[in-house]
Every structure is written in C-alpha cells, then in structure tokens.
Amino acid sequence: MGGFHRFFHIRMRLRVLYHDHCFDGAASAAFFSRFIRGKIHPDAEFHYTGMAHRASQIFEDSLFDGDENAIVDFKYSNNEKLTWWFDHHQSAFLTPEDALHFQTHPSPKKMFDPSFKSCTNYIRVKAEEIWGFTAPDLDELVYWANIIDGAQYPDPKTAVELGAPAMKLTLVIEGSKGSDTVQRIIRYMQRMPLTEIVAQPDIQDLYRPLYERHVNSMGIIREQADENGGVITFDLTGYDLEGYNKFIPYYLHPEGTYTVAVSPSSFRTKISVGSNPWSPVEPSHNLATICERYGGGGHARVGAISLEPGQVDEARRIAAEIAAELRS
C-alpha cells in the first residue's frame, strides 16, 4: 500500500475563467497558464471557461471547481474559492460591495490596474516583477494583445483588412461559435507563434467562412450606419453580426469620433459604444463611465451595455440617449 501512495500522484486542477471571444482574453489565459506551469505548479492540469458579459452577471459557485481558480481579463468575484485575479478594465467590479471586498481582502495573487492596454501585458509584467517569470517566446503574443486590445493600429485599414496573422486569428476568436475553438487557440498560443496557429487546418477551416462573413458585414454596416454630429450609429437587429469587427465604422466613416450600435444575440441585447482611435477630434467622453450608468462598463475609449435578450426597444432608447450625449 505504501508503494501505491508513493507512486500515485494527483495533478493540481486549475480552472481559468477568461473573457471569451476576445484576443486579449485568450492571450491572457495562455500567458497565465505558461506562468503557472513555469513558476508555480509545473504539473498543473488546466481547464478553461469562457465568460461573456450578460445583463444579470453572476458568478455561480460551480464555476470555481478547481484546486485553484483564476479569473483573467474579466470582472472580479468575491468567491472565497478564487485564488488568482488579473484585470485591467475600469469597470472591473460588478457592485460597490465587490470593490470593497477587493480593497479589504488584499492578496498578492489578485491584481487590478486599468492603466494597462492589455491584460496579457499586465500578467507578463507582474509575473516577472513578483515571481521572476519570463517567456520571451510569447513576446509576439503580448505585443499583439497590446495592439488589439489597446486599439494601437496605425490606421483603420490595418484593423479591418486583416493582413497580419494576429488579425486573422482575432477574426476566428471573435466570430467562432461556442468556446471550444477559443480554448484550442489558448492551448496553441502557449506553444506556437501566431503564424503557425493561423496555418493549422482547423483554424483555416473556420477562417475562410468567417472572412466571407467579415466582408459581408462591411456591406451591411455600410448600409445601416449613419454619421451625425461626429457619432456613427447603426442597428444590427435581424443580422447575425455579434462578432463584427468594431473598426469597420471608422473605416467607412473616418470623420466620425464615436460609434453607438445595437446588436441582439441569443444571450443578450448589446449596446456597443466606441471611439475612433484615428479621429481628427480628440474624444472627450469617458465611455466606461457612461456605460456604467446603464449597468455596463469597459474602458475610457470603449464600452458596452448588456441587456436581456429581446430588449431591443430599450436598447434603442439607451443608444439614442448615449448618441445624443456624445454629440453634445
């Protein structure tokens, strides 16, 4: 019996909750996994759960089923089973009580800094600063997470025409159904350069129809979008475009400073609020603060509000209010 116990080994089970259908969310999960395996738990077994913003956002206790549990690039939870947390969104807390819980329960494994352009880079900096972990082979991943999540593209053409492998991968991450594809990509990201990931047959099979959909979405938004007073508005009710490229409006209307769009899906009715990174007029409104008034959030330059499925009329009312405020 002693021999059995000596050789029998149960691997650490680590559950990672990440922002689903988001390049930075996937890259954050990948970098975090490499960090944990490289510095904390070398034999950890990773399980991933994609998280999406919903109107009634709650963290079910059953989500935290690991020996250790992590949330990356997504909102804070006060669940006692949460071990690790990294986020960079201004709107990182569901309630004031959650913010107070974070402040009064300090942990070196739970960190928040909205000054970072990407959560991936935030994890990279803290992993090196505190634990001495580095992964030079993931520098490309961190670089593109900063570009994509921080909207650091040189021009709308780069953001929309998808020339770089990272942009092609973003199309697949944002447009694929369910979470299985994104979770495969998270595992690929830990060991492959982006060019190699995009060349994988399973990714190519998804990319081709998604690219056709991307081209079609440009035509739909061209028809639906209207620019007035520096605000581009459009309503995608009736179209399956939940994962459309958010820079298309500025590609089509470079004179616009902001966008406000309504896009229903199976699990929410979404109001997207964004600002043009290349605008000739400097955006002056904090979009996260505006969205927070309606139960949403985000960053200063980009935010969103999630209502229940079917609340299209309410979404249109809110969108009109926000558009009027942005024109003022």
Which positions does each model-derived feature cover?
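Glycine-rich, Lys/Arg-enriched anion-binding loops that position phosphate/diphosphate groups
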Residues: 152-244
